[in-house]
Amino acid sequence: VQKERFRYFIKVPELAAFYNEITDYRTAEDVGVDRPHKNEILHHIPPTPEQEDFIQKLMQFAKTGDATLLGRPPLSETEEKAKMLIATDYARKMALDMRMIDPNYEDHPDNKASHCAKTIAEYYHKYDAQKGTQFVFSDLGTYQPGDGWNVYSEIKRKLTEDYGIPASEVRFIQECKTDKARKAVIDAMNAGTVRVLFGSTSMLGTGVNAQKRCVAIHHLDTPWRPSDLQQRDGRGVRAGNEIAKHFAGNNVDVIIYAVEKSLDSYKFNLLHCKQTFISQLKSGAMGARTIDEGAMDEKSGMNFSEYMALLSGNTDLLDKAKLEKRIASLEGERKSFNKGKRDSEFKLEAKTGELRNNTAVIEAMTEDWNRFLSVV
């Protein structure tokens, strides 16, 4: 089913002015909420040899639509129409872990799970005396009891086996099947007896007031909406975070893991652009007259040229894709301007003719009036 959404916005300052006529927008900073600052860290990860090989297959699939390259049956007629959405989904899974695509792939010391486990362990030991806690978010590879391999369990295995962190201090929010169990885990996070909590945006992003000891938040993937990222970060960047305030310079580190030659960085930057647009619109501080929200979303994936440029790692190709998009936009604006110009010229000519006719009528009527007055 074809989906439609707003992507391109014009006359943005006028839109912002109209919005601010009916709203009174204030941020936490505006009203002086006492909460930690967010320190974003983009953690770049080189692709593993298996990922490099799969990236080439993804590029060929995007060109040809040959699904057998990805180890799946040929695309149906319906799937063919959603080829770029399928390609985008595979690229997301590949960036998280190759075992998301095929569990027969081997572990690798430089994959995202290994980097995340190492970073979690560093924060764990750095704030061990204060019992600092950490949140780990991923909407892919979530924990499902008895459902085989998942990235949550893999990182927990590395934390316990490679870094000596007690298994009882690493929990998954999906383990909590009742409100009572959920509250017990939240209380344990605030007490510091649970130090690392994994979860998805929907299950851990809201209704979890476990910020008391939070020192770091880890994003293994990036959600589609800016509001979801804000909800994730809000687990630690909120009032009542005592450890961050007294022992971490009133900062909470937010680590975003991005595999090079994947869609990770692009998606994160796209999310930032959306959030900037929303914030500027609400505050009325708009600079640009037009906003392009971006071509990539969860319903349609991303366009072919940008997909190929990102996976190839060739920034020239990405710049070329952006310039081609800009040229197409300018050509559209030129056509619109020329059409408006022609319409205006036609109207001007018509009005000029009307003016000449009306002037002649006025002159004739004036002459008749003067003749009438002379007779009377």
Describe each model-derived feature in a short phrase.
Residues 225-247:
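Conserved SF2 helicase motif VI
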Residues 209-222, 253-256:
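A short beta-strand element within the Helicase C-terminal
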